[in-house]
A protein has these predicted regions:
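Cytoplasmic membrane-interface "Motif A"-like loop-to-helix N-cap segments
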Residues: 78-88, 270-284
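Intracellular juxtamembrane helix-capping segments at the cytosolic ends
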Residues: 120-132, 317-330
Length: 398
């Protein structure tokens, strides 16, 4: 039997981390493959000349997710994680098929709305927390976060090539197939989930917890900044002389280099009891990136590449540490609910980042997007300074 101070993950924990990261990766790869090519493809579809409709087709997924993260998270507390995850993935498959068969932008929007109805992020994250001990939870969250970053980089490279081979309809069909693979992973690869304690009246417990609400603001700000960045970065790279089809040459190294920095940061946060120090340092780095984006103004490729790499470092550290922190602070019987609220704020941030970022660029100017991001980072840093890092309970593997 492992000792109580054993820092090695058990085989069951490693299996849980790899399989849950695979579920996120399969689902997110299907989503990310659409992003680099849909706006161009939509010009050839009925309704594609309406920029607002095209934007809605891209953003409708996040909007539906925002409404359903809490119900799915709460349902996973009541009925178990796996049944809720499978149900959500089935909805995602249906939405992908609807979008694949769409003949106009309006039907693509319908498909994207149904895709977003499969809001499983909270349930998957809660299951990851259920299946891991405290001292390894941030590592598991880092595995999940890294898988998302990696498939994002892969999608930036693969999407134009796959689009040329199978078209937009083929990409949506591929998305459906990937989601089916995720369903089989949930059913046959993910370890059995422990029983979920059931309780009533826990929603107010979560909303009344100041620590949780600070983390909820943090994920809202983080993903608003992330989506708004993509309003600026592609256009900045084009202005710097890099054609759209070659943007992956910046994105892929930036993501991979960020992982090299992120992993030691996560290990230090776990082993050295430096969670709050690493957390606040990542927020400060986000603030510096926003200042750099404002000062640099998209004038050169190398400054943009460096800023993007630094952004991914901060983003990946925060993306790994925040869900782990939530799962430790939340009442044990309400982890699904707490993570549902957390993922709702994440989805709202994703939606507003694109919508507000685009509006600001159109009506105020590109610099206003960086000012907004910098302001959010300052508020977040102030809120985070009042947080107390959760204690890590070191327990032996079963």
């Amino acid at each position: 039997m492992a000792s109580p101070i054993d820092d090695k993950m058990s085989p069951a924990e490693r299996r849980a981390g790899v399989s849950l990261a695979a579920i996120f990766a399969l689902r997110m790869l299907g989503l990310f493959l659409i992003l680099p090519v849909f706006a161009v493809h939509a010009h050839g579809m009925p309704g594609g000349d309406n920029a607002a409709m095209v934007g809605m087709a891209i953003g409708a997924y996040g909007l539906t997710q925002a409404f359903l993260q809490i119900p799915f998270g709460t349902a996973s507390d009541r009925f178990g994680r796996k049944p809720v995850i499978v149900f959500g993935l089935v909805l995602f498959v249906i939405g992908s098929v609807v979008a694949a068969m769409a003949q106009d932008v309006q039907m693509v929007i319908v498909g994207r709305v149904i895709q977003g109805a499969g809001a499983i992020s909270a349930a998957v994250t809660a299951l990851a927390a259920d299946l891991t001990r405290d001292q390894h939870r941030t590592k598991i969250m880092a595995m999940i976060g890294s898988s998302i970053g990696l498939v994002f980089a892969i999608s930036m490279v693969a999407a134009p090539l796959l689009y040329a081979l199978i078209g937009m309809s083929g990409l949506f069909w591929l998305t459906a197939v990937l989601a089916v693979a995720a369903i089989f992973t949930v059913m046959f690869v993910v370890p059995a989930a422990p029983p979920v304690p059931r309780a009533i009246g826990r929603f107010s417990e979560v909303l009344g917890n100041g620590q949780l609400m600070r983390l909820n603001f943090g994920v809202f700000a983080l993903h608003l900044m992330q989506t708004a960045m993509w309003v600026l970065v592609p256009a900045g790279l084009v202005r710097a002389g890099l054609p759209m089809v070659e943007h992956w040459k910046v994105y892929l190294p930036a993501v991979l280099l960020s992982f090299v920095v992120m992993v030691p940061a996560i290990i230090m946060a776990e082993k050295k009891g430096a969670m709050k120090r690493v957390f606040n340092s990542a927020i400060i780095l986000l603030l510096l990136v926003q200042v750099g984006m404002y000062v640099e103004g998209g004038a050169g490729m190398w400054p943009l590449a460096i800023l993007l790499t630094l952004f991914f470092v901060a983003f990946n550290v925060l993306e790994a540490t925040q869900p782990s922190w939530i799962s430790r602070v939340a009442p044990p019987h309400a982890k699904g609910t707490a993570l549902g609220i957390y993922n709702t704020l994440q989805s709202i941030g994703l939606f507003l980042g694109g919508a507000l970022g685009g509006w600001l660029v159109q009506n105020v100017g590109p610099g206003s997007v960086s000012l907004l991001g910098g302001g959010l980072a300052v508020v977040w840093l102030i809120l985070a300074s009042g947080m107390v890092a959760p204690a890590t309970r070191r327990v032996a593997a079963a």
